[in-house]
Amino acid sequence: MADKYGPIFSLQLGIHKTIVVSSWAVAKECFTTHDKVFLTRPKSLAGKHMGYDHSVFLFLAYGPYWRDTRKLLIVELLSNRRLDVLKHVRESEVNSFVREMYEQWISNGGGGSKAVVEMKERFGYLTMNVILRMVAGKRYSGTEVYSDEARRFQKALGDLLHLVVLSMVSDAVPLFGWIDALRGYTGEMKNTAKEIDHVLGRWLKEHRQKRETLSINESEHDFIHGMQSVMDGSQFTEHDTDKAI
């Protein structure tokens, strides 16, 4: 279609007019030069059921709440200073990863003995532990002691990422939302949201209790602690504070 209609053209997908870009120069204009024009996203079934009715940054429309949330993300999670403070997390997790590999080698007799190792799964544990420690101060160890809660959360997170990218009939034609329900996607989204909400809710409660009873040094100050500190007693958002975090 790009060969026929050029590097930029529009399609009508249900109730939404969609622009298709196939040129890096045009893409730069859209997402760099005029990025604010393209920030607003249409409401979606995934945003409704898995994004706390479009309160999560991924599903937000551009506006004051989007700007405030983005500023907090950059300062509390993605700033050079924050990444430097939490450098020890990445180092310790890589060390643990290598140590577990070495211990498995020793348990197999060492020397010239060989063993098949599922590296994809192990790298998944490594990535998950780094992210969870930086965000929530949690560590779900790999291999056999990887907890049931960790597996449930990892599965729910994988389901969320899978469901978010699927095309839903109701996103294009809301009147036909019943089709998504018949296909089972609506129920899957609700169940996935409950699984994630259960875990995140417990983390928030634990962090709140820890802040009330203990002093927290900077190296232990994860993303949830930072967000709670900013939001406690502030008028940052009209949304529920826990949902915003």
From Swiss-Prot:
Protein name, as recorded: Cytochrome P450 CYP82H23
A Pfam family recorded for this sequence: p450
Cofactor: heme
One GO process term, biological-process aspect: terpene biosynthetic process
Keywords: Heme, Iron, Metal-binding, Monooxygenase, Oxidoreductase
GO molecular function, one term: heme binding
Role noted for this protein: Probable heme-thiolate monooxygenase.
InterPro entries: Cyt_P450 (IPR001128), Cyt_P450_E_grp-I (IPR002401), Cyt_P450_sf (IPR036396), Plant_Cytochrome_P450_Monoox (IPR050651)
Enzyme Commission numbers on file: 1.14.-.-
Induction: Down-regulated by methyl jasmonate (MeJA).
Organism the protein comes from: Panax ginseng (Korean ginseng)
Family: Belongs to the cytochrome P450 family.
